[in-house]
From Swiss-Prot:
Name of protein: Flagellar basal-body rod protein FlgF
Subunit architecture: The basal body constitutes a major portion of the flagellar organelle and consists of five rings (E,L,P,S, and M) mounted on a central rod. The rod consists of about 26 subunits of FlgG in the distal portion, and FlgB, FlgC and FlgF are thought to build up the proximal portion of the rod with about 6 subunits each.
Pfam families for this protein: Flg_bb_rod, Flg_bbr_C, LlgE_F_G_D1
GO BP term (any one): bacterial-type flagellum-dependent swarming motility
NCBIfam families: FlgEFG_subfam, PRK12640.1, PRK12641.1
Keywords of the record: Bacterial flagellum
Amino acid sequence: MNKAIYESMNAAIKLLDKQAVIANNLANISTVGFKESFNLFIKDRNLQNLKKTYNQNVKEYYNFYPGTLIHTQRNLDLVIKNNGWLAIKDINGQEAYTKNGHIKINKEGKMTVQNYELIGNNGNIKIPNNVNLKISSNGIIKEIKKNKDSIIESTIGSLKLVRLQNDNLIQKENGLFYLKKDNLNKYKNILHDSSVRIQSEMLEASNVNPTKNMIDMISNARQFEMNMKIISMCDQNTEYANQLFNVNN
């Protein structure tokens, strides 16, 4: 393969990957607790093994910087502070983690985030019908009953809150974070961390910077177009060279 064509084609493929990541970021501007991601590429001029070179060049990173805090005055809205995470079950029953603290209660009395069931510190959490709830800063869920002269609090359960290093996490297509494969054995049974703190009646907004992502998208589109022109020019030059060769022979 012509070296210029290969390099331009490889660059174009990577730009398409970048565009997909940016498009996903922009689609989640309004998603509570969403962390934007970006691809970094290491330039490698080894042309002997094209497939191997391409796979090793791409690495995805995440921006874990906190999003803006939004006051909601809703008891079931939470901000999970610092490097704490809320543990939930995905559709396959696998434990996953999120910063999205917009909790709802489904018809079965289960607490959910984006329709994923929350994991309790001591088993499943079952919320009775028509109760006033309060979630303490340590994740304990309480039922609040008001009498004429007093307020009675009774514990229903506790959220599973974990503390994880950002480098150990990977985000999948469903938007949830999971432990990387090489950390599964090390952290096989992640326990509740009682030191993790939450803030109720607030939500953490997406940390996506729409202006930056739009600028990057436009820049990538221009670079992609430039690479397509280079490929086209190389094809034309090859065709002209072949025609001249045929004429001379």
